[in-house]
């Protein structure tokens, strides 16, 4: 990335946040590498701007380009704020997950529609604090329109028996340790489908930033509830390596579809516009607003405080 331009002045509406198992996108032309500094610090990695079918796509490595950030250390606010600031409104996030259900086999993919938060407040999880308050709806944490696009791309996966499950509940645990066996059975009793350490607060922050957001989950193990084998890093790595081509095929197909839809209401997240802004403006009275907090909100939404 060292010889790429560090500025880019054209619209970038679509982003991929790559996690464990998807550290880069292949077959896309890199045209810039941005290193923004947000009011919440620097993002986890430079933001690569890639050209795909004539459409610009941003790629950010959630855990850093060397996987140096543990799940609780990921600068989620900086990641989402930096993407929003360059124009991104539509985010596809990739995550390796453990399966909590027999029918979701290692190497299967899941398009979750619900999430249960089992993080512990260690991770900063809102943009609206310190003198500005906002309460944003999160009943349906993922974007139904983006989920529909992902589901139509299942045909691009290869391999016997590999399935794309069209819904499910992802449990997000604190980590970085894996679950105890008792916890794993508890999550199953709650109706959890898969488990990871990354989807929150990322999805909550994307909602606050008025972005369409959908996670694609790739099962790498059966967590520790299953008698098959206890989860460990070696097992996760084995399945990720075996299925990395399918992960890249699926994400590539999704980007093909989204590139065709660039500038559409879905990609521009028109259906989320105003959700946060109304909540923030009506909650904190002008005399109670902290000037520094107002500047931070302005970074997300330029012109936010103008009447």
Swiss-Prot record:
CDD domains registered for this protein in UniProt: MTAP_SsMTAPII_like_MTIP
Residues the entry annotates as binding phosphate:
20, 62-63, 95-96, 198
Q: Which InterPro entries match?
A: MTAP (IPR010044), Nucleoside_phosphorylase_d (IPR000845), Nucleoside_phosphorylase_sf (IPR035994), Purine_phosphorylase-2_CS (IPR018099)
Indicate yes or no for the key word Disulfide bond: no
Q: List the residue ranges forming a coiled coil, or say none.
A: none
Q: Where in the cell is it found?
A: Cytoplasm; Nucleus
Catalytic reactions on record: S-methyl-5'-thioadenosine + phosphate = 5-(methylsulfanyl)-alpha-D-ribose 1-phosphate + adenine
| Subunit and partners | Homotrimer.
Q: What is this protein called?
A: S-methyl-5'-thioadenosine phosphorylase
């Amino acid at each position: 990335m060292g010889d790429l331009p560090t500025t880019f002045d054209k619209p970038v509406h679509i982003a991929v946040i790559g996690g464990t198992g998807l550290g880069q996108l292949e077959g896309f032309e890199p045209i810039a590498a941005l290193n923004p500094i947000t009011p919440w610090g620097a993002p986890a990695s430079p933001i690569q701007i890639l050209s795909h079918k004539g459409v610009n796509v941003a790629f950010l490595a959630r855990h850093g380009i060397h996987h140096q950030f543990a799940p609780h250390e990921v600068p989620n606010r900086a990641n989402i704020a930096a993407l929003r600031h360059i124009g991104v409104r539509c985010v596809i996030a990739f995550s390796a997950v453990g399966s909590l259900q027999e029918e979701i086999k290692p190497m299967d993919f899941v398009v979750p529609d619900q999430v249960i938060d089992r993080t512990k407040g260690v991770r900063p999880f809102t943009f609206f604090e310190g003198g500005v308050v906002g309460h944003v709806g999160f009943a349906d944490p993922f974007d139904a329109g983006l989920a529909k696009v992902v589901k139509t791309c299942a045909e691009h996966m290869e391999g016997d028996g590999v399935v794309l499950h069209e819904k499910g509940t992802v449990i997000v645990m604190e980590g970085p340790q894996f679950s105890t066996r008792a916890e794993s059975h508890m999550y199953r009793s709650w109706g959890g489908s898969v488990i990871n350490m990354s989807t929150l607060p990322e999805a909550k922050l994307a909602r606050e930033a008025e972005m369409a957001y959908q996670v694609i989950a790739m099962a790498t193990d059966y967590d520790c509830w299953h008698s098959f084998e206890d989860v460990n890093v070696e097992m996760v790595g084995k399945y990720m390596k075996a299925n990395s081509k399918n992960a890249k095929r699926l994400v590539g197909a999704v980007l093909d579809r989204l590139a065709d839809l660039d500038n559409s209401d879905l990609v521009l997240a028109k259906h989320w516009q105003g959700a946060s802004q109304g909540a923030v403006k009506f909650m904190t009275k002008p005399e109670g607003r902290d000037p520094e907090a107002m500047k931070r909100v302005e970074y997300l939404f330029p012109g936010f405080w103008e009447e």
